[in-house]
Design a protein with these regions (language model features):
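Structural signal for hydrophobic packing residues in well-ordered secondary-structure cores
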Residues: 15-22, 116-119, 160, 212, ...
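A gly/proline- and charged-residue-enriched helix-loop-helix capping module
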Residues: 69-105
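Short, charged beta->alpha transition segments
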Residues: 28-38, 76-87, 111
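Alpha/beta enzyme core
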Residues: 66, 70, 90, 103-220, ...
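Short glycine-enriched loops at secondary-structure junctions
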Residues: 51-53, 78-84, 128-129, 172
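An N-cap/entry alpha-helix motif that binds or orients negatively charged groups
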Residues: 1-41, 283-284, 290-294
Length: 294
């Protein structure tokens, strides 16, 4: 294997290093239904928290949301205006709003309150957008960012009143602090290779699950391109997976095309479930996964 600093390539290599065994005896047709925060979805394949999709397709953000609604998937949304979020929720997509770690906590709380008011099922924060990679805090389109403390996360959890999910967790230390703050879920992610040599989210998952002890759902983000990729995450204990960049090229073809790929990935997932003796998502078994050593 050729070594690289590219975290996306490292993540892809890790996915491809995991093999599965089959289990046909006593197997049957599977269900991919998933319940999250009291809502039932047809698939654990979620849309990832993307932003600024108008640069990819006209009305890209609402197309993306409509696709999630058509597929019965959880929809995540990233940075954007209040009006855009209202349009997204109006599509009928059950939406989780991920908020940037704005330096001004009043802006964070304002965005939380607006998201709850318009009907988002949950809110959260991508904590990994705090720094610029050059030793300073990040600045996103002129908006200053800042790392958040455990106490600040507690304040956001209390302000939300709905589940608060933290995205960008890639260590046991951060996972433990998020639990201490009262967060209702974690997204294991390196934000599309924001840091070189980052641990693949799927590699970090088992230790994070061990540390959290099943108290909150844990999701996997980054590099998921197929139902087989999703299966590997779910088998190792993830509640659901986020798919973003893999879907972006389809936005120009409309919501139906994006939904079609989500549906295909869900069917691929079901295909692997049936061949490994898994009838429901809560019966996933990590012992079907083997790490390639040749």
């Amino acid at each position: 294997m050729q070594l690289t600093s590219n975290s996306d390539k490292i993540t892809r290599d890790y996915f491809d290093s995991l093999l599965i065994e089959t289990r046909y005896v006593d197997a049957g047709l599977p269900s991919t239904e998933m319940t999250l925060f009291g809502v039932t979805f047809r698939t654990p394949v979620m849309t990832a928290a993307l932003s600024h999709l108008h640069n990819t397709a006209l009305n890209g953000m609402t197309i993306y949301a409509r696709a999630a609604a058509l597929s019965g998937a959880v929809h995540w949304v990233g940075m954007g205006s209040d009006e855009e979020l209202e349009e997204i929720v109006a599509t009928g997509a059950r939406t989780i709003k991920s908020i940037k770690p704005h330096a001004d906590n009043r802006e964070v709380v304002r965005k939380i309150e607006h998201a709850v008011k318009v009907g988002c099922m949950a809110v959260g924060m991508d904590i990994d957008h705090a720094f610029n990679g050059k030793g300073g805090y990040d600045d996103v389109f002129g908006l200053p960012m800042k790392a958040k403390s455990t106490e600040e996360l507690k304040d956001f959890v209390e302000a939300a009143g709905v589940p608060f999910v933290v995205k960008g967790v890639l260590s046991v230390k951060d996972a433990e602090k998020c639990l201490k703050a009262g967060c209702a879920g974690l997204v294991v992610s390196h934000h599309h290779g924001m840091v070189q040599y980052a641990v693949p989210p799927l590699m970090a998952l088992p230790d994070i699950l061990s540390a959290t002890g099943g108290e909150v759902p844990v999701f996997v983000d980054c590099g998921i391109e197929s139902g087989m990729d999703a299966y590997k995450c779910l088998a190792l204990g993830a509640k659901a997976v986020s798919v973003g960049r893999h879907l972006m090229p389809l936005l120009k073809e409309g919501a139906e095309a994006v939904a079609g790929r989500i549906d295909e990935m869900t069917a691929e997932l079901a295909g692997v479930m049936s061949r490994t003796g898994v009838r429901t998502l809560d019966k996933m078994d990590a012992t079907v996964i083997h790490r390639r050593a040749f």
